[in-house]
């Protein structure tokens, strides 16, 4: 039953949707409520002034209060009640809006009634019920009734308020009570096989734990150390993980433990943790390690009970340790965990494989040889599949898609022979160590070699082995491990005993939390399905990206024998053009699109030297299989590119499109490509040939294409910068007390600078989004001095400052270095480093190659689908024009034609085609050549926490506060102090 509730002085409303949270804030502002407090758990968790009254599971809170009947001064500001001339006070209405990380309980069904003396104003945004009442529904679904009467009688302002009672002094005393006086203690461990990026994960857990006010311990030697205890459980300090970002393997060790598999071993581990006061554990490992961790958690209460019975502890001593909090992170080069796109170390291992196979290709071509390359992957073929795509292998053997018993030999021969006949000089076959046929017989590298020898090929075997685990982590794995490590600590602090153990994963570009038990269970089902010979189920349990890429590989490589040719009427002419500055993976994407087109009967055309080449020469080249066969690992652009855009001569471009009868266009490029797509789309009214489907694959090192969070070439750029800055940092550390100011590219987009700063542990990052001024430089100087003051000439103490090339017209890289040098008073030295066009990279990274292949095939399918939507009669002119005239009226033969000019975009966990018209109007900053959304701002915040800048600033602020007795300010990132102020005003403006 819905009741009307009067006189509500305080109300708390919750939502798990950030969009609804903002809409609700705007709604109550429109009713006259004013924001009196904003709280963000990520930024303000340790601010004693802001944390008072906030709820434990709030991600954000906005406190709103109504002061509609208060006296205002000449500026329109509310006069404090004690200073008001009328000595009247309002009843006061407070609303607390909360953004929570779990789905909130249903809100009350009751209608809350508020009084107003401005009912006419309220009626403009609500529904008039009668002369005295207006009904509204807030974005969270709560019904609000606003009235100017009581019992049918209209009230005036004086009747809403009461005389101030001077004999009663309202006093609110808020005390901060630490309900649990002990510090939260978190342990972190690595277990199972090592993988690149584990050290970055440990570093993130250690430093974010310290930042959030926790004690943190490292468990050395995995579960073995957990059982042994003592020196194997070591408290970690900030400096202990300095320099770990660039280290391979795991510096805290890993080992498989037979003892932990026994209950007595787990009981001993429980005892060791309680001895140290630890009740939270971050486990970085594979499915076996994570299964053991969850079993440990489920047994924990009974283990504690047994320890009390054994007399090891008293009831009082274990009172605070009744539950163990477990958070899992997947560290595995196999990438075999269900529910997550990639695991820590997988892309680094893939990069090693690609490097080795690229080297092998050179000698194989020289001698016209075949190579069989064995890669890791006992129950998972991710490395086998991705390396097959990235290295242009002729054939792959993976466990999820077993080869047909007794038949795979002939198919392998046919594929390799066909590719030789097309002009290929070498053959590469990738064999996962867990490869088998559909009768569960293992397929070994030796067996594959014997088949190729029968074909008459000089064949060699290369088993890569533990090379795949070696080396430092690539940029992707450092980024993944860092973000997941911080999120693991935040998960621990937000968890209750009832919360299921989470597993930190990633979907496309978004870090997610999944139920650990369910993820491990799904992972083990893959091996069970293979054992049961249910290979369709096995591959279906992999993520959609895996299935999609496997299908693409088969289409472009194994089944390029004419079996997939479409009917003549469905075969298309598809143009491919590169626009803008060169970036890695342009050739890899062109290769994948070409091979997919050829396998289906389409004719791919390369527009050479960009749109200016088409305008000036009209040169178009039809691409063949042998033209693109070895483009998978070539940087730059084989068909030529420049910064010319379509608008230079639309008429000539339309002529050549019509002349070559193009049915679709794939543009690869950065902002120039983006602009060209918009120009072609806008030219449709004048040039009907542009009605063909057109799509853009974002490809630029700057990653500044609006609408998407990923561009081809940006990963290669970041890997180049990681190698460069690692070398620079080593030099800075060797010299002791040295700072390098490194200038990176990116135009007006700070993505490259922010990402580089995060994965290299930079002290400061200057980006165009956060303006540089003297104040920020002074604060950075104070931080550098403070940082070096505590260092006693240890190793790994070199510092990096990352500056985007467009961060400031005044404060250039050289000027920044000069200012820091001048103010350092010889406490430390400063040098500059500008990598320049080295950032474009040479050989494209494995990640860029794989994503290039995926995007390219998606774009060809996009063009196919839009051509199928053409309902024109079998008339060539109508088919090309995509419209005809019926009784003098122009009628389009393709519905929603505007959607056929689109950009392939990655947003969070989603890949989609976004119409260029929508992105241009809603998501583009045309003047600054980038998107409006700064999706990488979190990198700066996390980077500041892990580099120590946030903690040092907090310390300096505290000292200043003690000296001046001023209240502390919110903890905001240093390099965005001035912008944070304006950003706060801007944020408020959204709600007011």
Swiss-Prot record:
Pathway: Carbohydrate degradation; glycolysis; D-glyceraldehyde 3-phosphate and glycerone phosphate from D-glucose: step 3/4. Its EC number is 2.7.1.11. Beta-D-fructose 2,6-bisphosphate 2 binds at residues 738, 831. It is an enzyme of class 2 (transferase). Residues 1-558 are annotated as: N-terminal catalytic PFK domain 1. SUPFAM superfamilies: Phosphofructokinase. InterPro entries: 6-Pfructokinase_euk (IPR009161), ATP_PFK (IPR022953), Pfk_N (IPR040712), PFK_vert-type (IPR041914), Phosphofructokinase_CS (IPR015912), Phosphofructokinase_dom (IPR000023), PKF_sf (IPR035966). GO terms for molecular function: 6-phosphofructokinase activity; AMP binding; ATP binding; fructose-6-phosphate binding; identical protein binding; metal ion binding; monosaccharide binding. Gene3D superfamilies: 3.10.180.90, 3.40.50.450, Phosphofructokinase domain. Beta-D-fructose 6-phosphate 2 binds at residues 369, 460. This is ATP-dependent 6-phosphofructokinase subunit alpha. The lineage of its organism: Eukaryota, Fungi, Dikarya, Ascomycota, Saccharomycotina. The gene is PFK1.
């Amino acid at each position: 039953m819905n009741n009307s509730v009067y006189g509500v002085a305080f109300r708390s409303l919750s939502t798990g949707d950030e969009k609804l949270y903002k809409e609700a804030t705007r709604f109550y502002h429109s009713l006259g409520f004013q924001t009196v407090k904003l709280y963000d758990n990520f930024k303000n968790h340790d601010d004693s002034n802001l944390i008072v009254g906030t709820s434990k599971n709030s991600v954000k809170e906005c406190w709103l209060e109504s002061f509609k009947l208060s006296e205002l001064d000449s500026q329109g500001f509310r006069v404090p009640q004690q200073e008001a001339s009328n000595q009247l006070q309002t009843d006061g209405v407070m609303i607390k809006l909360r953004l929570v990380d779990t789905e909130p309980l249903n809100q009350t069904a009751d209608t809350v009634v508020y009084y107003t003396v401005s009912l006419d104003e309220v009626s403009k945004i609500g529904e008039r019920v009668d002369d005295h009442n207006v009904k509204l529904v807030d974005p969270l679904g709560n019904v609000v009734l606003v009235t100017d009467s009581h019992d049918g009688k209209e009230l005036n302002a004086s009747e809403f308020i009461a005389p101030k009672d001077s004999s009663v002094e309202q006093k609110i005393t808020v005390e901060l009570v630490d309900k649990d006086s002990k510090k939260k203690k978190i342990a972190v461990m690595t277990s199972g096989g090592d993988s690149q990026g584990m050290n970055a994960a440990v570093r993130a857990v250690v430093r974010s734990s310290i930042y959030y006010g926790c004690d943190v311990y490292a468990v050395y030697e995995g579960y073995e150390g957990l059982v042994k205890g003592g020196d194997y459980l070591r408290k970690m300090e900030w400096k202990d993980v300095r320099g770990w970002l660039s280290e391979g393997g795991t510096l805290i060790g890993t080992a498989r433990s037979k003892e932990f598999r026994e209950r007595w071993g787990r009981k001993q581990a429980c005892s060791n943790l309680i001895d140290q006061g630890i009740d939270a554990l971050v486990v970085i490992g594979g499915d076996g390690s994570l299964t053991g961790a969850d079993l440990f958690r489920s047994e924990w209460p009974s283990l504690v009970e047994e320890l009390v019975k054994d007399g090891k502890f008293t009831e009082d001593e274990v009172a605070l340790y009744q539950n163990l909090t477990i958070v899992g992170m997947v560290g595995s080069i196999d990438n075999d965990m269900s529910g997550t796109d990639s695991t820590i170390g997988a892309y680094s291992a893939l990069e090693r494989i690609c490097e080795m196979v690229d080297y092998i290709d050179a000698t194989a071509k020289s001698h016209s040889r075949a190579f069989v390359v064995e890669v890791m992957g006992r129950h998972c073929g991710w490395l086998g599949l991705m390396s097959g795509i990235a290295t242009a292998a002729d054939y792959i053997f993976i466990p999820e898609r077993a080869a047909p018993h007794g038949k795979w030999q002939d198919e392998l021969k046919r594929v390799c022979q066909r590719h030789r006949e097309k002009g290929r000089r070498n053959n590469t076959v990738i064999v996962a160590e867990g490869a088998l046929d559909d009768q569960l017989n293992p397929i070994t590298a030796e067996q594959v070699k014997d088949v190729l020898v029968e074909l008459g090929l000089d064949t060699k075997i290369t088993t890569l082995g533990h090379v795949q685990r070696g080396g430092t982590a690539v940029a992707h794995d450092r980024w993944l491990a860092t973000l997941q490590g911080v999120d693991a600590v935040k998960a621990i602090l937000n968890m209750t005993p009832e919360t299921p153990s989470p597993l930190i994963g990633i979907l496309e570009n978004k870090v997610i939390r999944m139920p650990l038990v369910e993820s491990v269970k799904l992972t083990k089902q893959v091996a069970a399905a293979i054992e049961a010979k249910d290979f369709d189920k096995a591959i279906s349990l992999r993520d959609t990206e895996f299935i999609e890429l496997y299908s693409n590989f088969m289409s472009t490589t194994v089944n390029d024998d004419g079996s997939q040719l479409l009917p003549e009427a469905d075969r298309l002419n598809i143009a491919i053009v590169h626009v803008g500055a060169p970036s890695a993976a342009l050739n890899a994407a062109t290769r994948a699109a070409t091979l997919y087109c050829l396998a289906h009967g389409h004719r791919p055309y390369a527009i050479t030297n960009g749109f200016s080449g088409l305008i000036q020469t009209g040169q178009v080249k039809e691409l063949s299989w042998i033209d693109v066969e070895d483009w998978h690992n070539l940087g730059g652009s084989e068909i030529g590119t420049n910064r010319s855009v379509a608008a230079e001569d639309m008429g000539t471009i339309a002529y050549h499109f019509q002349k070559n009868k193009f049915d679709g266009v794939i543009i690869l490029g950065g902002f120039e490509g983006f602009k060209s797509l918009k120009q072609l789309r806008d030219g449709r009214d004048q040039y009907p040939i542009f009605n063909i489907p057109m799509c853009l694959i974002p490809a630029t090192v700057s990653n500044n294409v609006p609408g998407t969070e990923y561009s081809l070439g940006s990963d290669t750029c970041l890997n180049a910068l990681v190698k460069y800055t690692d070398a620079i940092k080593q030099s800075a550390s060797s010299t002791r007390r040295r700072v390098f100011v490194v200038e990176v590219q990116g135009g007006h987009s700070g993505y490259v600078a922010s990402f580089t700063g995060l994965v290299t542990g930079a002290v400061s990052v200057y980006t165009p989004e956060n303006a540089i001024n003297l104040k920020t430089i002074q604060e950075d100087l104070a931080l550098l001095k403070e940082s070096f003051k505590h260092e006693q000439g240890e190793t790994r103490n070199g510092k990096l400052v990352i500056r985007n090339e467009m961060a400031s017209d005044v404060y250039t890289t050289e000027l920044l270095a000069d200012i820091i040098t001048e103010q350092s008073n010889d406490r430390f030295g400063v040098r500059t480093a500008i990598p320049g066009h080295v950032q474009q990279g040479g050989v494209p990274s494995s990640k860029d190659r794989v994503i290039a292949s995926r995007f390219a095939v998606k774009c060809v399918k996009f063009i196919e689908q839009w051509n199928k939507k053409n309902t024109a009669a079998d008339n060539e002119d109508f088919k090309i024009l995509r419209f005809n005239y019926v009784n003098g009226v122009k009628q389009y033969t393709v519905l929603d034609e505007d959607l056929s000019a689109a950009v392939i975009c990655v947003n969070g966990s989603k890949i989609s085609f976004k119409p260029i018209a929508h992105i241009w109007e809603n998501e583009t900053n045309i003047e600054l050549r980038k998107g409006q959304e700064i999706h990488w701002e979190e990198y700066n915040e996390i980077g500041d926490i892990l580099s120590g800048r946030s903690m040092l600033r907090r310390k300096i602020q505290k000292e200043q506060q003690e000296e001046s007795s001023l209240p502390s300010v919110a903890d905001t990132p240093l390099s965005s102090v001035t912008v944070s102020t304006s950003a706060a005003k801007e944020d408020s403006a959204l709600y007011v």
